[in-house]
């Protein structure tokens, strides 16, 4: 949107760019903290998020904008009116949820991630390359974060601080659903959404 690229090209490029950014963050900032308490890693990533947000202000200022490919109007599903961006985001979230479930249950990479998340030492004793799994995990996280950024941008206005809203909602979701449970996180997210809607 900022550089005037076609919408489809922007969507195609944002995913690998997110993966590369996630990979670089792991290599440069997270890997040196391997073996340190979880709180140290969390503080590092929060600090890095603040720095990246500051760079966004320097480059583009505080301007907000809408994604140019966001569908307008309303979709009628029987008696129900649905905002297109919200419907697309919901379906995409379900697809990502299913893909992650399949990844963690039926693939070697996914199973390795689960073992590493549970215990680094056990993972190493089983021959799992912990550092490699970390790199893959962060690259995947960056890619999914990029996709989520596009989906959120289809519903809300894109601003430099839009990530803070997701962070503020993400922590309660993790506490409700659990740190290692994708279905639990999904249920926690739905519960939080219902609570916000009713509140």
Residue ranges and their predicted role:
Residues 2, 19-23, 27, 58, ...:
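Membrane-embedded alpha-helical segments of multi-pass transporters/permeases
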Residues 3-5, 33, 37, 107, ...:
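Membrane-helix interface residues
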Residues 4-16, 135-145, 149-199:
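Transmembrane alpha-helical segments in multi-pass inner-membrane proteins
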Residues 5-48, 55, 187-192, 196:
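Alpha-helical transmembrane segments within multi-pass membrane transporters and channels
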Residues 18, 22, 79, 119:
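Glycine-rich phosphate-binding loops of nucleotide-dependent enzymes
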Residues 30-35, 73-76, 112-125, 197:
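Short amphipathic alpha-helical coupling elements at transmembrane boundaries
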Residues 32-106, 133-136, 198:
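Transmembrane helix-bundle core of multi-pass membrane transporters
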Residues 81-159, 182-188:
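Helix-loop-helix "hairpin" substructures at the membrane interface of multi-pass membrane proteins
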């Amino acid at each position: 949107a900022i550089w005037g690229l076609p919408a489809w090209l922007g969507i195609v490029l944002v995913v690998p760019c997110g993966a590369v950014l996630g990979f670089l963050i792991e290599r440069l900032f997270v890997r040196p903290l391997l073996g340190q308490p979880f709180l140290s890693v969390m503080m590092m990533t929060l600090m890095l998020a603040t720095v990246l947000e500051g760079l966004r202000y320097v480059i583009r200022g505080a301007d907000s904008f809408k994604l140019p490919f966001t569908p307008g109007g309303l979709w009628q599903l029987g008696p129900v009116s649905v905002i297109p961006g919200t419907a697309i985001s919901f379906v995409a979230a379900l697809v990502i949820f299913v893909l992650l479930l399949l990844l963690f249950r039926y693939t070697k990479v996914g199973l390795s991630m689960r073992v590493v998340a549970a215990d680094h030492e056990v993972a190493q004793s089983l021959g799992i390359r912990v550092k490699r799994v970390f790199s893959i995990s962060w690259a995947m996280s960056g890619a999914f974060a990029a996709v989520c950024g596009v989906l959120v941008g289809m519903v809300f206005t894109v601003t430099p601080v839009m990530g803070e809203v997701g962070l503020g909602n993400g922590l309660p979701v993790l506490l409700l659903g659990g740190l290692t449970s994708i279905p639990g996180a999904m249920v926690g997210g739905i519960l939080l959404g219902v609570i916000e809607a009713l509140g």
